[in-house]
């Protein structure tokens, strides 16, 4: 029996329509080509002995070669993990080994890290290369060339396995339960996308790296719904606008730092492009500062949609632009996983009070890590991602920070996000992170790390200006005492800043004092 989300059915219906398009080059992979290539790779996997529940890993830049491999795994009941190619060799080795991959497919430009990952992965049996030749490593194109372009006999749905943001150590692998359903049934996200307006007429623009949960899930789900997915090799703010205009993009996905970079384009550049085709600008992955989101809604209109979720898939919250305008700062109401706000003793807190967020949604476990799995669950079966937040009287969820990011200065809780939002839209600030650093008197001192905009002169003058500007929005006791101006931030694949790295790299010799303003302190 054929199911509507079976790629064979989609290829018969959409044929030479583009399934995936590389934004920069315009190179495309049609539905028909995707069907044939993914079938050939699927047969290769079966020939190599891979069976339902086995695991493969991929190590590639954003490129068309990824998708036939994704789909081959998806249609043969395999788990597949795309490894962040910006990781160190040690980190890549850990993921390829931890996920127990039997096959690794990598691109030729990443051979150095791929070779080390392969050498350190105990269960790896086969390795293939795309995008060039590597001595001693078989070409995937050559290996699949003689395989049939028709489906294998035992198709079933596979699943992607992600590694959640490693904000406090090694990335945590989230192993989902393999669905025991025929290929073509589709995954949960595939069936949710029509609620966001996805249809065969949709054109989706992915601006993020294809080793992260949302870009993979939405790019796969787009094609499942008969639509076209465009991807960028790396985010560029003006190119994004150009692609939206030229390709008539209907849906695009961002993280807040991308919004900031787009908003800081000159006005004449932003007005140069026709963005009228855009139905939804979806954002997630990190909290969006209120001034940034206000500016995006002013620019695009009520097309900005936010969701909050984790790779653990234990919750999913959504909020539209009209809802957000009357609940500024919220990440929405629950679609999956009701939220509970608990204090340190596990008691449920009333609306308006900040506590740790727990969810009674779908269960999960961290792969081969029972201690982290246990720490993320309580006796009621609820689970947490480690975030702090609160609920209002209407059930809208608001995020504060992660518990590990909280600053306690002079016995007072300081939430970095609030301080960051007070400065995020200053024209001299390209990005900002606020951390707590050791202080003999206060325990922790509030320290801002600022990535300055191009052409800005960083120094004591700018520090004073930022302090004055922030003082118009937040109480004086929340103002940073020192600031460091940097050229780049260490980041996770999602775009989140690695605060632990900033804390570890803190050097008081580089810190610039921010003036103490003559305002009453708490």
Segments from the language model and where they lie:
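AMP-dependent adenylate-forming
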Residues: 6-30, 132
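Structural core segment of the AMP-binding/adenylate-forming
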Residues: 7, 47-48, 75-145, 153, ...
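Conserved AMP-binding/adenylate-forming core of the ANL superfamily
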Residues: 19-63, 67-70, 88-93
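Conserved AMP-binding A3 loop
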Residues: 28-32, 159-186
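AMP-binding/adenylate-forming catalytic core of the ANL superfamily
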Residues: 87, 104-106, 242, 252, ...
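Gly/Ser/Thr-rich phosphate-binding loop
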Residues: 160-162, 166, 224-225, 249-254, ...
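Conserved AMP-binding/adenylation subdomain of ANL enzymes
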Residues: 181-203, 207, 211-251, 265
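AMP-binding/adenylate-forming catalytic domain of the ANL superfamily
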Residues: 472-496, 516-521
């Amino acid at each position: 029996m054929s199911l509507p989300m079976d790629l064979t059915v989609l290829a018969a219906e959409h044929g030479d329509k583009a399934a995936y398009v590389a934004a920069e080059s315009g190179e495309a992979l049609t539905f028909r080509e995707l069907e044939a290539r993914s079938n050939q790779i699927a047969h290769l996997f079966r020939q190599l002995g891979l069976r339902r529940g086995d695991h493969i890993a991929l190590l590639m830049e954003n490129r068309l070669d990824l998708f036939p491999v994704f789909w081959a795994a998806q249609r043969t009941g395999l788990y597949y993990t795309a490894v962040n190619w910006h990781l160190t060799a040690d980190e890549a080795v850990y993921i390829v080994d931890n996920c127990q991959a039997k096959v690794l497919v990598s691109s030729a430009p990443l051979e150095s890290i791929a070779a080390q990952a392969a050498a350190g992965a105990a269960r790896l049996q086969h390795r293939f290369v795309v995008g060039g030749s590597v001595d001693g490593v078989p070409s995937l194109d050559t290996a699949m060339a003689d395989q049939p372009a028709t489906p294998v006999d035992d198709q079933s749905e596979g699943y992607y396995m992600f590694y959640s943001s490693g904000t406090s150590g090694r990335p945590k692998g989230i192993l989902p339960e393999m669905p025991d359903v025929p290929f073509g049934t589709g995954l949960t996200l595939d069936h949710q996308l029509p609620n966001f307006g996805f249809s065969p007429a949709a054109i989706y623009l992915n601006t993020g790296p294809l080793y992260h949960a949302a870009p993979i899930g939405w790019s796969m789900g787009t094609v499942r719904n008969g639509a076209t997915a465009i991807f960028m090799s790396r985010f560029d703010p003006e190119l994004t606008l150009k692609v939206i205009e030229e390709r008539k993009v209907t849906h695009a996905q961002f993280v807040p730092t991308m919004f900031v970079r787009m908003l800081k384009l000159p006005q004449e550049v932003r007005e140069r492009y026709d963005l009228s085709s855009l139905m939804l600008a979806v954002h997630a992955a990190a909290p969006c500062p209120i001034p940034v989101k206000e500016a995006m809604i002013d620019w695009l209109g009520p097309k900005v949609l936010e969701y909050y979720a984790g790779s653990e898939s234990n919750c999913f919250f959504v909020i539209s632009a009209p809802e957000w305008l009357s609940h500024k700062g919220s990440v929405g109401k629950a679609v999956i996983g009701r939220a509970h706000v608990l204090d340190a003793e596990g008691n449920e807190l009333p609306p308006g009070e900040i506590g740790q967020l727990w969810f009674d949604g779908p269960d999960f476990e961290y792969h081969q890590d029972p201690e982290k799995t246990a720490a993320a669950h309580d006796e009621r079966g609820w689970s947490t991602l480690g975030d702090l937040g609160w609920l209002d009287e209407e059930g809208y969820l608001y995020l504060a920070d992660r518990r590990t990011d909280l600053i306690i200065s002079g016995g007072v809780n300081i939430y970095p996000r609030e301080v960051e939002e007070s400065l995020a839209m200053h024209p001299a600030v390209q990005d900002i992170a606020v951390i707590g650093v050791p202080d003999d008197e206060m325990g922790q001192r509030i320290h801002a790390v600022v990535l300055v905009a191009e052409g800005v002169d960083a120094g004591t003058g700018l520090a004073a200006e930022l302090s004055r500007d922030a003082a118009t929005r937040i109480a004086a006791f929340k103002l940073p005492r020192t600031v460091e101006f940097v050229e780049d931030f260490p980041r996770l694949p999602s775009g989140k800043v690695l605060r632990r790295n900033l804390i570890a790299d803190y050097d008081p010799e580089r810190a610039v004092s921010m003036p103490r303003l003559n305002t009453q302190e708490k």
